[in-house]
């Protein structure tokens, strides 16, 4: 590695992975060889529907493997030097930070305030930082919690900076046992902080039990008789750094946009656009960082890390946003639910950084405001380009906001000292119908039209020709709590795959705009890979049923052991497993972690991906609409878990969801096929071979949690309704297979 220049704020390092490249190419050519074998079979034995299905599935696998190999072909890594940036404090640009929450029950306020507290304590001048909290649930409890958290922040932030505390989310900091570390003064201060935090927690818990929302008074009176989906806008400045003190507290603003039952609110994308407009009137910072309410700041230098890139002239001219990885603190041993995303964050996203840049993942990202206002990389400052009537059509009818947007597009930085003067104007831009006849959600701001608004927004930014960067600092920038069990991560995955498939068939598809946008070819392949992951369920299910059919109906679709061509599928299997294992070894994970993630990928494909495809088909037929579902946020601390609960943390759980029916059906079919095959009840001489048996056994092993769920009880067992439906479908499949032999 070359020694970095003394004046450089960052270094871009190209990572070499020759072994992985060789395996990728070998696997691809083996897939082509398998397809050639299928064509030879058709030539010698004639067209058979069994071979035709196998050929179509394997063609898809070859195509999808080419997309997959593209992801990690040219990985890069950025190394930043924030200490060098500290010499240029006066040059630091202002940053507006958005934190979004939607439901005080599914997303308890204590989680949100920990994220807010960790943000208020970052190493960045407080007079150039503003925190906006969007509450889509219009909860008096959330506002009260933020107001109480401010009192704690006044002693917490100085404590963190005085003692250089690394983890600045109180619930995580106080979960560590540090009783014997530090000076007596530090120990005294720490005990005082812990006691104050426990009191804060208790006040919030008491408020949750005692609030009578119809009779709120004082500062909470605005929340009286409000409903989450029917209320006027509520915007309150909880704290304003009026003196512009660098070592004080950043601005803290509460925002609850107006909602009306008859006006579409566009879920999180709509909330983000309201935050963009409100902040544009109050602070109008050129950079905006957004966080989910459960992703606290784990690295206090994180904004400095991003500015090391944005201060570079080339990056400032070509790059739209800096994305940080999503990491989790509740990492169970060997990742039993495959929800730590380590391979995605450490390998896939670094691979994308070597093309046009990573996708925008909805949290842990710093955007340039002018990019979200629609500016292209080769477009100069607007100057007199737009007339006033054009600007009103783009940004809406607020004169004050159009003025602030114009200043951004002209690269004029302003940072008003008094937020209260902007309060009246902010209510106008937070109304439910403000975006009517404007370009919000289409040409400017976060994009509408998909429940994965983050991916869509990032892709449209890339389509304009912008690039993005990916930073992986140590310690990780942000940490959250990964969902545990079975239904929650599967429902989250179903929502994502539904939104991705919606985008694929929309006018924003990377295929539909191939002739007109500025996506690089390999970046287009990346987005195709992402959008097609949901469709992957169909060929995988078809291919999973082929060995079972062969065992039941006494056919074969794989070469027999005595045939030399058996080497092709055998080598494919071995090299594919080896290629996957190398990724886990490279990221310091165990072989057991590879196995857990592999089987969870299979389970997700058969469960959530399939239901995502069905949901989109029903939407196309006009039978239903896709909806944005808020997932329950957890805030677990390992110190609170008992030994017995630790043993249950890695156990798979089930509910009444229909998504478990397909995979349970496939498991029953494999068990029935293996039983019929080994009992030898098929008519005539045995035709199926070792390949078909191996495939079925492999699927049973992959779906082992489902097999255990068939016999377990309670939440760890499959519901009787799921078992009955799956049994009926499995019986029907076996019956049709036996009928095909007659």
Where are these regions (language model features)?
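Membrane-helix and juxtamembrane interface regions of eukaryotic multi-pass membrane proteins
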Residues: 471-478
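Glycosyltransferases that elongate glycans
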Residues: 1-467, 479-480, 490, 496-742
């Amino acid at each position: 590695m070359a020694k970095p220049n003394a004046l450089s704020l960052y270094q871009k390092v190209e990572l070499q992975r020759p072994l992985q490249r060789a395996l990728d190419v070998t696997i691809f050519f083996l897939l082509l060889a398998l397809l050639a074998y299928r064509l030879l079979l058709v030539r010698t034995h004639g067209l058979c529907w069994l071979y035709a299905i196998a050929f179509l599935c394997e063609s898809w696998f070859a195509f999808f493997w080419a997309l997959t190999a593209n992801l990690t072909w040219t990985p890069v890594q950025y190394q930043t030097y924030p200490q060098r940036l500290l010499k240029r404090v006066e040059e630091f640009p202002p940053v507006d930070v958005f934190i979004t929450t939607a439901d005080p029950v599914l997303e308890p306020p204590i989680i949100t305030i920990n994220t807010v507290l960790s943000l208020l304590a970052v190493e960045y001048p407080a007079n150039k930082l503003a925190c906006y909290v969007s509450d889509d649930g219009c909860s008096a409890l959330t506002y009260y919690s933020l107001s109480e958290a401010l009192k704690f922040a006044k002693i917490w932030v100085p404590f963190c900076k005085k003692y250089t505390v690394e983890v600045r989310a109180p619930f995580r900091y106080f979960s560590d046992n540090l009783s014997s570390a530090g000076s007596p003064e530090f120990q005294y201060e720490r005990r005082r902080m812990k006691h104050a935090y426990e009191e804060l927690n208790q006040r919030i818990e008491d408020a949750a039990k005692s609030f009578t929302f119809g009779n709120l008074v004082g500062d909470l009176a605005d929340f009286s008789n409000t409903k989450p989906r029917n209320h006027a806008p509520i915007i309150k400045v909880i704290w304003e750094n009026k003196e512009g003190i660098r070592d004080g507290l950043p601005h803290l603003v509460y925002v609850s946009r107006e909602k009306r039952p008859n006006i579409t609110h566009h879920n999180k994308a709509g909330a983000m656009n309201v935050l963009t407009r409100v902040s544009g009137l109050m602070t109008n910072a050129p950079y905006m960082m957004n966080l989910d309410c459960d992703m606290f700041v784990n690295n206090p230098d994180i904004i400095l890390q991003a500015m090391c890139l944005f201060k570079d002239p080339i990056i400032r001219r070509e790059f739209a946003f800096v994305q940080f990885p999503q990491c989790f603190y509740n990492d169970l041993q060997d990742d039993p639910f495959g929800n730590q995303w380590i391979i995605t964050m450490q390998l896939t996203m670094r691979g994308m950084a070597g093309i046009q840049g990573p996708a925008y993942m909805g949290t842990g990202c710093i955007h340039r405001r002018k990019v979200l206002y629609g500016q292209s990389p080769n477009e100069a400052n607007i100057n007199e380009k737009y007339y006033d009537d054009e600007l009103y059509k783009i940004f809406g009818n607020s004169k004050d906001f159009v003025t602030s947007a114009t200043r951004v597009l002209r690269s004029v930085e302003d940072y008003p000292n008094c937020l209260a003067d902007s309060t009246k104007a902010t209510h106008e831009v937070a109304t439910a119908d403000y975006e009517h006849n404007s370009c919000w959600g289409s040409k400017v701001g976060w994009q509408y039209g998909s429940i994965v608004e983050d991916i869509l927004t990032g892709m449209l930014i890339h389509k304009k020709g912008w690039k993005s960067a990916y930073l992986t600092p140590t310690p990780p920038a942000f940490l959250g709590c990964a969902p545990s069990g079975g239904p929650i991560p599967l429902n989250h995955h179903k929502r994502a795959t539904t939104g991705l498939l919606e985008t694929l068939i929309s006018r924003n598809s990377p295929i539909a705009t191939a002739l007109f946008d500025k996506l690089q070819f390999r970046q287009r392949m990346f987005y195709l890979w992402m959008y097609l992951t949901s469709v992957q369920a169909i060929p995988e299910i078809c291919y999973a049923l082929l060995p079972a059919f062969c065992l039941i109906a006494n056919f074969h679709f794989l070469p027999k052991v005595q045939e030399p061509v058996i080497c092709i599928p055998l080598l494919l299997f071995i090299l594919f497993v080896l290629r996957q294992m190398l990724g886990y070894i490279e990221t310091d994970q165990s072989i057991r972690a590879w196995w857990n993630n592999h089987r969870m990928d299979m389970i997700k494909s058969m469960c959530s991906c399939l239901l995502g495809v069905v949901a989109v088909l029903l939407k196309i037929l006009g039978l239903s609409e896709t909806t944005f579902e808020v997932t329950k946020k957890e805030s677990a601390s390992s110190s609170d878990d008992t030994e017995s609960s630790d043993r249950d943390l890695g156990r798979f759980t089930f509910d009444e969801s229909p998504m478990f029916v397909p995979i349970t059906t496939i498991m029953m079919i494999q068990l029935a096929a293996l039983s019929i095959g080994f009992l030898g009840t098929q008519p005539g001489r045995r035709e199926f071979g070792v390949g078909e048996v191996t495939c079925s056994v492999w699927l049973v092993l992959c779906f082992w949690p489902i097999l255990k769920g068939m016999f377990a009880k309670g939440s760890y067992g499959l519901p009787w309704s799921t078992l009955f439906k799956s049994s009926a479908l499995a019986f029907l499949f076996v019956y049709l297979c036996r009928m095909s032999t007659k």
